[in-house]
Amino acid sequence: MATHHTLWMGLVLLGLLGGLQAAPEAQVSVQPNFQPDKFLGRWFSAGLASNSSWLQEKKAALSMCKSVVAPATDGGLNLTSTFLRKNQCETRTMLLQPGESLGSYSYGSPHWGSTYSVSVVETDYDHYALLYSQGSKGPGEDFRMATLYSRTQTPRAELKEKFSAFCKAQGFTEDSIVFLPQTDKCMTEQ
């Protein structure tokens, strides 16, 4: 149980990276002319979709978390997320290493010993970002996750609709798409 919760937190930190759904591995595009400097700053995890069974098991207990994106020295991004866990605020940082193109990154999971690809699929920099992560936790355990980030804790309805449509296009089912409820815990500047 704690292991699955830890994985979720590590992945949601970038809105990122379990029970499989039958769907082909999706090829997703990356935001054209991605501008990392405009992507920096505070984001809130507003929505998740995953083919992992832990999402179904944990979705009732999940809530929005705050993430801050900062530049890393290697040209990548540091994604620091603060979330509520066991009635305490916990903070974790993920290093997203630069990939083959701007907006494409990789994340090495210390928990699973695996590397996941993370793509900024679409963003307007001011309101929302759609991210898509994929990789493998082990033989036969392909992992896929989509994350909706919002600059506010109350994303507009059309952003939620856009996220749902994107997720369905990637083969996620309706019950694997979750919009995270707002919380006032762990959201203040630290």
Swiss-Prot record:
Reaction(s) catalysed (UniProt annotation): prostaglandin H2 = prostaglandin D2
Protein's cellular compartments: Rough endoplasmic reticulum; Nucleus membrane; Golgi apparatus; Cytoplasm, Perinuclear region
Residues with glycosylation annotation: 51, 78
Signal peptide extent: 1-22
Swiss-Prot/TrEMBL GO biological process terms: mast cell degranulation; prostaglandin biosynthetic process
Record function comment: Catalyzes the conversion of PGH2 to PGD2, a prostaglandin involved in smooth muscle contraction/relaxation and a potent inhibitor of platelet aggregation. Involved in a variety of CNS functions, such as sedation, NREM sleep and PGE2-induced allodynia, and may have an anti-apoptotic role in oligodendrocytes. Binds small non-substrate lipophilic molecules, including biliverdin, bilirubin, retinal, retinoic acid and thyroid hormone, and may act as a scavenger for harmful hydrophobic molecules and as a secretory retinoid and thyroid hormone transporter.
Known partners and oligomeric status: Monomer.
EC number: 5.3.99.2
Sequence similarity: Belongs to the calycin superfamily. Lipocalin family.
Pfam families for the chain: Lipocalin (PF00061)
Chief location: endoplasmic reticulum
Disulfide bond residue pairs: 89-186
Gene source species: Macaca fuscata fuscata (Japanese macaque)
Example of a GO MF term: prostaglandin-D synthase activity
Active site: 65
Domain remark text: Forms a beta-barrel structure that accommodates hydrophobic ligands in its interior.
Keyword annotations from UniProtKB, A to Z: Cytoplasm, Disulfide bond, Endoplasmic reticulum, Fatty acid biosynthesis, Fatty acid metabolism, Glycoprotein, Golgi apparatus, Isomerase, Lipid biosynthesis, Lipid metabolism, Mast cell degranulation, Membrane, Nucleus, Prostaglandin biosynthesis, Prostaglandin metabolism, Secreted, Signal, Transport
GO cellular component, one term: extracellular space
PROSITE patterns, alphabetized: LIPOCALIN
Protein name from the UniProt record: Prostaglandin-H2 D-isomerase
Entry superkingdom: Eukaryota
